Amino acid sequence: WDIGYVSTPIKEYIDQVDNKELRILIPGAGNSYEAEYFHNQGFNNVTVVDISEQPLKNIKIRIPSFPSLNLLYQDFFDLKGEFDIIIEQTFFCALDPTLRQDYVNKIHDLLSEQGKLVGLMFDAPLNTEHPPFGGKKKDYKTLFEPKFNLKTIELAYNSIKSRAGKEVFVNFMKK
């Protein structure tokens, strides 16, 4: 799961974003190399939430200038706030599939008007008893379409080698 750096699809997406003041959330982020990359690119409003405290401590060690107030040790489903972009990078697949509708609802609640869920989801069966749980593109469409305009849900052309052909890049805008 932890590849040790920001994944290419996420990096290439954020490199196209000019507004450094956007409020960005990375849920279930683990060591969040995405947050480190965004911070180093000048994004000022990046928030990381994780149910495990150690990865948040690791982020602060790696990036001493990262605002401590934006490293939230709590359950994603209890989070309050409003964000312009929520980054999906191996959080959805870590959740028990019975929580997927709750995830969609919570993402929708946390996004601002015109807010976006952007990131990667596995388009492969993977595991059924433990994370990472896989999924199918068609199921994601069914799950997200009631609350989101599905701008992009395509096989990621720039996945890392070990995930090539197994993940879709998504860009869903809040309805």
Segments from the language model and where they lie:
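Conserved acidic residues
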Residues: D84
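Short catalytic micro-motifs in class I SAM-dependent methyltransferases
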Residues: T90-A94
